Amino acid sequence: MLKVAILDDYQNVSQEFVDLKKLSGKYEFKIFSEPFLDEADAIEQLADFEALLIMRERTPISKNLIDNLNDLKYIITSGVRNKSVDLEAAKRRKIIVCGTESNTNPTCELTWALILGLSRNLKTEIDNMYQGYWQTTVGFELKGKIIGLIGLGKVGSQVSKIANAFGMQVMAWSENLDLDKCKELNVLPCSKEDLIKTSDYISIHVQGGDRYKDCITIKEFDQMKKTAFLINTARGPIVNEDDLIIALSTNVIMGAGIDVYENEPLSETNKLRFLPNALLTPHIGYVTAENYSIYYTQMIEDLEACVNGKPIRVIEK
C-alpha cells in the first residue's frame, strides 16, 4: 500500500471532509495534527512516506526536505499554488506536485472582519463586556475614509468592491498594477508613497516571495498617519514584524489587524500577543468548512489520478 502523510491537520478535521476508510485498502494514511519541531524532525517522521498531502504553507517543503525523503513520489498541496514547495527540487527528483482549487472570498471576508473590529474597538469592547463594563471606547465610521490596497488581484479586487459599498475612497498600488482594472473597480491608482501617507486603512493583498518581502518597514510606518490601521491577511514577511511591534508599541500608528506572521504558528511569547492595539487571528483567512471541503476532496482526487498515471492539476511553476 502507498504510504500517505496528511500534514498539519491542526483542528483534526480532515476525516470530516473525506472518508479515508473507503481508501484503506489502497493507502496507508497517517495524520499529523501538530507542527514538526524543525526540518530535521520532519525528515525523520516523513522518511518512509511516498505521498505528502499538505495544508497550504504550514510545513515548508524545502529542497533539503525533498532530497532527504527518498521514497517520496507525490506532493499534493491545498490551493492553486504553494510558494513553500521547492518546485525545482521536486522536478529534479521527478516528484509530481499537484494542487487544488480554492475560494478567495474567505480571505476578503476576514479582512473586513479585522477592519471593522479595529474601527469599532471590538477586542476591547468584547473583553470589557464580559467583565461587566458598558461602552468604554469610541469607534470610527468607514464612510469617507481612505483605504489603500497593496495589491489588486482576486482578493484585493473583492475588498475594493466592499470598500466602495461602504462609501470609502479606494486607492491601490502594486508593482504590476492593472490600470484597466482600477478604472473598472473605481479604484485610484497611486504610488506606494502616496498610498502610505494618505490612507486611513492599509490592507495588503499581494503574494509572498522576495518581491514584496519587507514591503512595510519602520520607514513606511513613520510615513503613515498616526490614526492609520494596517491589515495583513496576505503573507507575514511582507511586513517586517520587528518594525510592526515597534510601531504598535510606540503608537506610531493606531493599530493593526494581522492574520499572517513571519513564523507560524506564532510563538506564545511573541510580543504581538501582548499589544492592546493588535487584533490578531491565527492565519484563518482560508480556514472555512467550504474551503476545507474543496481541499481535502480534491487532494484525494489528485492522489488517485497520480497513482493511476494520469495526474491532474499539476503545478510546474
Predicted regions and their residues:
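Rossmann-like dinucleotide-binding domain for NAD(H)/NADP(H)
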Residues: V97, T227-K317
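Phosphate/diphosphate ligand-binding glycine-rich loop within oxidoreductases
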Residues: F49-I126, F140
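Phosphate-coordination loops involved in phosphoryl transfer and adenosine-cofactor binding
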Residues: M1, L72, K143-I146, I218, ...
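N-terminal glycine-/charge-rich "phosphate-binding" loop or analogous flexible N-terminal tail
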Residues: M1-A51, M55-R56
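Oxidoreductase and adenylate-handling cofactor-binding alpha/beta cores
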Residues: C108-D127, K161-M168, T297-A305, K310
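Short beta->alpha connector loops
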Residues: Y10-N12, E34-L37, R56-P60, G79-N82, ...
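Glycine-rich NAD(P)-binding loop of Rossmann-like domains
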Residues: E125-Q158, L185
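Rossmann-like adenosine-cofactor binding region
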Residues: A47, P60-K63, N176-K271
